[in-house]
């Protein structure tokens, strides 16, 4: 009984992870959001975000 419950839980977690990965792959974002790497060769930060020099991360800036 415990084994079947664990199997169902892990199966649902795997299904969720695969669907999230597919969603990210299909949206193909053209800009970097919060804590995304930025700089040379990387996509620019989205609106309301700025690339912080030294950290090279997109940080929210009003």
Curated annotation (Swiss-Prot):
Covalent S-S links between cysteines: 31-46, 38-51, 45-58
Record localization: Secreted
GO cellular component terms, semicolon-separated: extracellular region; host cell postsynaptic membrane; host cell presynaptic membrane
Annotated GO MF terms: ion channel inhibitor activity; potassium channel regulator activity; sodium channel regulator activity; toxin activity
Domain note: The presence of a 'disulfide through disulfide knot' structurally defines this protein as a knottin.
Signal sequence, renumbered to the chain: 1-21
Known tissue expression: Expressed by the venom gland.
Prosegment residue ranges: 22-29
Magnesium as UniProt keyword: no
Pfam family name, one: Toxin_12
Protein's recorded name: Delta-theraphotoxin-Cg1a 1
InterPro entries: Huwentoxin-1
Free-text function comment from the UniProt entry: Inhibits voltage-gated sodium channels, preferentially subtype Nav1.5/SCN5A (in cardiac myocytes), but also Nav1.6/SCN8A and Nav1.7/SCN9A (TTX-sensitive Nav in rat DRG neurons) and invertebrate Nav (in insect neurons) as well as voltage-gated potassium channels of the subtype Kv2.1/KCNB1. Is suggested to bind to site 3 of the sodium channels and inhibit the inactivation of the activated channels, thereby blocking neuronal transmission. On potassium channels, inhibits activation of channels with an IC(50) of 8.05 uM through a voltage sensor-trapping mechanism.
Keywords, comma-separated and alphabetical: Disulfide bond, Ion channel impairing toxin, Knottin, Neurotoxin, Postsynaptic neurotoxin, Potassium channel impairing toxin, Presynaptic neurotoxin, Secreted, Signal, Toxin, Voltage-gated potassium channel impairing toxin, Voltage-gated sodium channel impairing toxin
Similarity-based family: Belongs to the neurotoxin 10 (Hwtx-1) family. 33 (Jztx-1) subfamily.
């Amino acid at each position: 009984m415990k084994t079947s419950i664990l199997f169902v839980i892990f199966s649902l977690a795997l299904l969720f992870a695969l669907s999230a990965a597919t969603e990210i792959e299909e949206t193909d974002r053209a800009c970097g959001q919060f804590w995304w790497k930025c700089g040379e060769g990387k996509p620019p930060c989205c609106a309301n975000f700025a690339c912080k020099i030294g950290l090279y991360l997109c940080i929210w800036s009003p």
